[in-house]
Amino acid sequence: MNSTVKTIVFWVFILACCILLWQVFQRSSNTGKEQEISFSQFLNDAQQGQIHDVTVVGGEVHGHFRSANAAFHVEVPTNYPQLYDILNKNHVAVTVKDNSGSPWWSILIQFSPVLVLVALWFFMIRQMQSGGNKALSFGKSRARLLSMQQKKVTFKDVAGVDEAKEELKEIIEFLREAQKFQKLGGRIPKGVLLVGPPGTGKTLLARAVAGEANVPFFSISGSDFVEMFVGVGASRVRDLFEQGKKNAPCIIFIDEIDAVGRHRGAGLGGGHDEREQTLNQLLVEMDGFEANDGVILVAATNRPDVLDPALLRPGRFDRRVVVGRPDVRGREEVLRVHAKKVPLAEDVDLRVLARGTPGFSGADLANMVNEGALSAARANRKVVTMQDFESAKDKVLMGAERKSMLLTDEEKRVTAYHESGHAIVAAMRKHADPLHKVTIIPRGMALGVTMQLPEEDKHTVTKDYLETQLAILMGGRIAEEIFLHQMTTGAGNDIERATEMARKMVCEYGMSRLGPLTYGKKEEQIFLGREIAQHRDFSEETARQIDAEVRSLVDEAYRASYQLLNDNQPIMHKMAAALLERETIDANDIRMIIEGKDLPPLKPSGGSGTATTDDVQQVLKPSSDRGAGGLPEGSPSPA
């Protein structure tokens, strides 16, 4: 019986109970208007001629008196045959009604109040269940079933993570042909843990595995287990695995498993809490699987360091698949997947876009394609152009433009020199990344941005690279001192980042005269998920040496940038003027300014246009005396 039929039957039952209840009350109200008299009084009144008419219904007599036409009723014995003779002799009108109907109707009328109360109770329970309270289903799993009839996701929809797909293809073979592996003594993996940064496609990979294997897919979040009531989490875990076994072979996917799988005993309020009971039940269920159940648990997290060791051991999560950010070839594949539904102009080169987006995750690339489509729609274009994608990339990297933010002329001048200081140091220092764009249009929380993109993906960086970044960060403050003869708060974030970078070089990377040593043991709480303190495991003298080394690194970068900007004052003035005139200059503009060439006149729309990624790759390639650059990993430098 489906839910629609159940609903109809339920409301028909409610209507019948209401009718019964109405008849009971109607009968009670009619009876209350009649005067109840004794049988002897009834006979006496009949013999005296005071009764006008009567109606005989079984063992009851209803009638009216002649005076005032008052109504009465009386119970009469069934074995009193003289009753009709007395009534006829005294000229009383007699009406007899048959009472030979079904006795069930009388029984229903008698029990109708109880039935109505039961119906109301069921109605209230249904209302509570259909609302947010779930009064009787707290212990039920909230997993959503993605059945085989729904839209499938396959490996064709997943790109840029070839290694992860290869790892998961064996899982598909296990689900399709489990007997093939069991004949050779192989054991089907009980769990697969997907580990990687946010936005890399862990959830999409899990759905693709279910789609390729053509099996049911249960999806639930780690936060859906624990509620305010004790024992609910463990009950939901049991119910989840019971559903999985009924639909085997299947996949159970738990997203953000760190919400329920954190290290036990690390809570600030003690070790015996509801989350730990849920984790214990999860451990028992995973360890209790039989080899031929055909239920595989897939979980995803970006914090594997906080998970309980018992959850990660072989026999529970047998495999750990790392899903990282895609490389340049992977980014091109991801862009092709997301661009299938987008009409592209002829000038769009996805390979160039992939080269210009190092460090982007799959979600970032999908967002960029979507923003490009929205940009084209706002301009009433029928196709998405390369300029739309470049604008979308800038929006993803630097934030949306805040053109409505009003800045005074003096604030614009300060921002122009500040960003020019960053750009000149980045363009004339070796070991730096290519500049992409400089703007004094407020974006995000910054009044201006100097943006650069690495030529290739970086996995490790050198000491020379970090020293170059320190010099670039100091460029904004130095430009204010040399050309404006004052300091502003705009350099606050630059100084903070430079200090943090220099301290890491000394205390973590061993890039100082103190040698390859680590100073300051971090104190982390698994419950909080991040460090809350730093244990000082060195002496006062060592602390002074650390401070001296940090200051030495920052001072050296400061002196180098000061000398560079002081020697190139004409270029600084020219770049600041170009920024004040155009608000945004791209890679070609920066190259022409440094080479002493005049910039082309402004376009009618105002502005020098948007830089393409080809420009980014061509700007001031590193040479023996200077290189092209910017801030690390495409991070914008706030003014």
From Swiss-Prot:
Ligand binding (Zn(2+)): H418, H422, D494
Coiled coil: none
Side Cytoplasmic, residues: 1-4, 126-639
Annotated keywords: ATP-binding, Cell inner membrane, Cell membrane, Hydrolase, Membrane, Metal-binding, Metalloprotease, Nucleotide-binding, Protease, Transmembrane, Transmembrane helix, Zinc
GO annotation, biological process: protein catabolic process; proteolysis
SMART domains in the cross-refs: AAA
Cofactors demanded by this protein: Zn(2+)
Quaternary structure and partners: Homohexamer.
Catalytic residues of the enzyme: E419
Cellular location(s): Cell inner membrane
InterPro entries with a match to the protein in the record: AAA+_ATPase, AAA_lid_3, ATPase_AAA_core, ATPase_AAA_CS, FtsH, P-loop_NTPase, Pept_M41_FtsH_extracell, Peptidase_M41
Main location: membrane
Bilayer topology term: Multi-pass membrane protein
Residues that span the membrane, as ranges: 5-25, 105-125
Species this protein is from: Acidobacterium capsulatum (strain ATCC 51196 / DSM 11244 / BCRC 80197 / JCM 7670 / NBRC 15755 / NCIMB 13165 / 161)
NCBIfam families according to UniProt: FtsH_fam
Function: Acts as a processive, ATP-dependent zinc metallopeptidase for both cytoplasmic and membrane proteins. Plays a role in the quality control of integral membrane proteins.
Cofactor binding comment, as recorded: Binds 1 zinc ion per subunit.
Binding positions for ATP per the UniProt entry: G196, P197, P198, G199, T200, G201, K202, T203
Family to which this protein belongs: In the central section; belongs to the AAA ATPase family.
GO cellular component assignments: plasma membrane
Matching SUPFAM superfamilies: FtsH protease domain-like, P-loop containing nucleoside triphosphate hydrolases
Periplasmic side stretches: 26-104
Pfam families named in the record: AAA (PF00004), AAA_lid_3 (PF17862), FtsH_ext (PF06480), Peptidase_M41 (PF01434)
Chain residue ranges for the region called Disordered: 597-639
EC number(s) per entry: 3.4.24.-
Protein name: ATP-dependent zinc metalloprotease FtsH
